[in-house]
Amino acid sequence: MAEPRQEFDTAEDHAEGYALLQDQEGEHGLKASPLQTPADDGPEEPVSETSDAKSTPTAEDVTAPLVDERTPGEQAATQPPTDIPEGTTAEEAGIGDTPNMEDQAAGHVTQARMVSKGKEGTGSEDRKAKGADSKTGTKIATPRGTAPPGQKGTANATRIPAKTTPSPKTPPGTGEPAKSGDRSGYSSPGSPGTPGSRSRTPSLPTPPTREPKKVAVVRTPPKSPSSTKSRLQTAPVPMPDLKNVRSKIGSTENLKHQPGGGKVQIINKKLDLSNVQSKCGSKDNIKHVPGGGSVQIVYKPVDLSKVTSKCGSLGNIHHKPGGGQVEVKSEKLDFKDRVQSKIGSLDNITHVPGGGNKKIETHKLTFRENAKAKTDHGAEIVYKSPVVSGDTSPRHLSNVSSTGSINMVDSPQLATLADEVSASLAKQGL
């Protein structure tokens, strides 16, 4: 469980290192020139020495897998800067035992962590900035004489167990080619070709007056394995070296084994039924034709000339039954001549019953003349016909009669009032 976590940390350190390298190149204007590391002086000397000790190969590093016997100066002089494509091992590229950029970065990361754990009081901002620069950017080897012997021993002491720790998953014989192939997969995600060429160019000595610009390193929190897996999948991963890989349980011993079966051929042959015998001898009567089925239905007319009746009914064949010859005649009846009354009622046919000679007389009712008011108001109502002769005028007539009654002709309002009263009384039946 410790190895996958260490590989994820190195991949993150690679990404941060290339980001810082691009920032330094943009600030110092060194995009077209090879990578240069500023000189370390002042209070930053222990950190620079530690970084030099980390990157300087010594005699004790011969036991480490990826260490060259020559000095880095000789390596830079003898070998020109070449671009090595990703996914190739050191033996295929023809470099020999020269450590590549990814192995140096991985070694720097592990050494820096172990040194920081072993030492106390190394938590200042300058040490963090310088540790980040040595971890990510300074991958160029320096001569052996630059580092003090005391620090060289500590760097080698910390580097040997980090480099020679055997992996429990890979055999010891095939650890270094597999590691170089795996480390080559953790190249820069942006430009995979340029960091290799920069790491193999010799560093030029920088003037001591120029001080490196301190860059604050922001440590990102550790990412989850799912995010790192998604980020690692986007980078071009070379094909792993499967020649020296051994399975855990020996499942590759029968790798070329081909399982049996699968060679069954289904052949369709016609069945030979010539010699087949029936189970119960049913072929003995195979040509038997069952009887029946040959009945012909013939339609012939029935001869009824010689047919005799059952009970001698032909003797009365011409017999006509009686009845049915009744004729309904319509004759006009003469009642006057032939009809007589039952009880002699025609004797009194001219009799006129008594009564019925009364006359209904129609008399005109003189109700208005005889009408009187219910309440006696002391005046007599005299009614006269409204027809008045032309020679007489209303003024000529007296308004009051001799008896003192009011004349209805002179006052039309009283006349209308009397008419209304008489009409209402007539309706009431008085």
From Swiss-Prot:
<feature type="repeat" description="Tau/MAP 1">
    <location>
        <begin position="233"/>
        <end position="263"/>
    </location>
</feature>
<feature type="modified residue" description="N6-acetyllysine">
    <location>
        <position position="279"/>
    </location>
</feature>
<feature type="modified residue" description="Phosphoserine">
    <location>
        <position position="274"/>
    </location>
</feature>
<comment type="subunit">
    <text>Interacts with MARK1, MARK2, MARK3 and MARK4. Interacts with SQSTM1 when polyubiquitinated. Interacts with PSMC2 through SQSTM1. Interacts with FKBP4. Binds to CSNK1D. Interacts with SGK1. Interacts with PIN1. Interacts with LRRK2. Interacts with LRP1, leading to endocytosis; this interaction is reduced in the presence of LRPAP1/RAP.</text>
</comment>
<feature type="cross-link" description="Glycyl lysine isopeptide (Lys-Gly) (interchain with G-Cter in ubiquitin)">
    <location>
        <position position="364"/>
    </location>
</feature>
<dbReference type="GO" id="GO:0005886">
    <property type="term" value="C:plasma membrane"/>
</dbReference>
<feature type="modified residue" description="Phosphoserine">
    <location>
        <position position="405"/>
    </location>
</feature>
<feature type="modified residue" description="Phosphoserine">
    <location>
        <position position="398"/>
    </location>
</feature>
<keyword id="KW-0832">Ubl conjugation</keyword>
<feature type="modified residue" description="Phosphoserine">
    <location>
        <position position="33"/>
    </location>
</feature>
<feature type="modified residue" description="Phosphoserine">
    <location>
        <position position="341"/>
    </location>
</feature>
<feature type="modified residue" description="N6-acetyllysine; alternate">
    <location>
        <position position="306"/>
    </location>
</feature>
<feature type="modified residue" description="Phosphoserine">
    <location>
        <position position="294"/>
    </location>
</feature>
<feature type="cross-link" description="Glycyl lysine isopeptide (Lys-Gly) (interchain with G-Cter in ubiquitin)">
    <location>
        <position position="243"/>
    </location>
</feature>
<feature type="modified residue" description="Phosphothreonine">
    <location>
        <position position="220"/>
    </location>
</feature>
<feature type="modified residue" description="Phosphoserine">
    <location>
        <position position="345"/>
    </location>
</feature>
<feature type="compositionally biased region" description="Polar residues">
    <location>
        <begin position="48"/>
        <end position="58"/>
    </location>
</feature>
<feature type="cross-link" description="Glycyl lysine isopeptide (Lys-Gly) (interchain with G-Cter in ubiquitin); alternate">
    <location>
        <position position="320"/>
    </location>
</feature>
<feature type="modified residue" description="N6-acetyllysine; alternate">
    <location>
        <position position="374"/>
    </location>
</feature>
<feature type="modified residue" description="N6-acetyllysine">
    <location>
        <position position="214"/>
    </location>
</feature>
<feature type="modified residue" description="Phosphoserine">
    <location>
        <position position="48"/>
    </location>
</feature>
<feature type="cross-link" description="Glycyl lysine isopeptide (Lys-Gly) (interchain with G-Cter in ubiquitin); alternate">
    <location>
        <position position="358"/>
    </location>
</feature>
<protein>
    <recommendedName>
        <fullName>Microtubule-associated protein tau</fullName>
    </recommendedName>
</protein>
<feature type="cross-link" description="Glycyl lysine isopeptide (Lys-Gly) (interchain with G-Cter in ubiquitin); alternate">
    <location>
        <position position="310"/>
    </location>
</feature>
<feature type="modified residue" description="Phosphothreonine">
    <location>
        <position position="392"/>
    </location>
</feature>
<feature type="modified residue" description="N6-acetyllysine; alternate">
    <location>
        <position position="248"/>
    </location>
</feature>
<dbReference type="GO" id="GO:0008017">
    <property type="term" value="F:microtubule binding"/>
</dbReference>
<feature type="modified residue" description="Phosphoserine">
    <location>
        <position position="385"/>
    </location>
</feature>
<dbReference type="InterPro" id="IPR002955">
    <property type="entry name" value="Tau"/>
</dbReference>
<dbReference type="GO" id="GO:0031175">
    <property type="term" value="P:neuron projection development"/>
</dbReference>
<feature type="cross-link" description="Glycyl lysine isopeptide (Lys-Gly) (interchain with G-Cter in ubiquitin); alternate">
    <location>
        <position position="306"/>
    </location>
</feature>
<feature type="modified residue" description="Phosphoserine">
    <location>
        <position position="203"/>
    </location>
</feature>
<dbReference type="GO" id="GO:0005829">
    <property type="term" value="C:cytosol"/>
</dbReference>
<feature type="compositionally biased region" description="Basic and acidic residues">
    <location>
        <begin position="1"/>
        <end position="16"/>
    </location>
</feature>
<dbReference type="GO" id="GO:0030425">
    <property type="term" value="C:dendrite"/>
</dbReference>
<feature type="cross-link" description="Glycyl lysine isopeptide (Lys-Gly) (interchain with G-Cter in ubiquitin)">
    <location>
        <position position="256"/>
    </location>
</feature>
<feature type="cross-link" description="Glycyl lysine isopeptide (Lys-Gly) (interchain with G-Cter in ubiquitin); alternate">
    <location>
        <position position="300"/>
    </location>
</feature>
<feature type="modified residue" description="N6-acetyllysine; alternate">
    <location>
        <position position="270"/>
    </location>
</feature>
<keyword id="KW-0597">Phosphoprotein</keyword>
<feature type="modified residue" description="N6-acetyllysine; alternate">
    <location>
        <position position="300"/>
    </location>
</feature>
<feature type="modified residue" description="Phosphothreonine">
    <location>
        <position position="158"/>
    </location>
</feature>
<keyword id="KW-1003">Cell membrane</keyword>
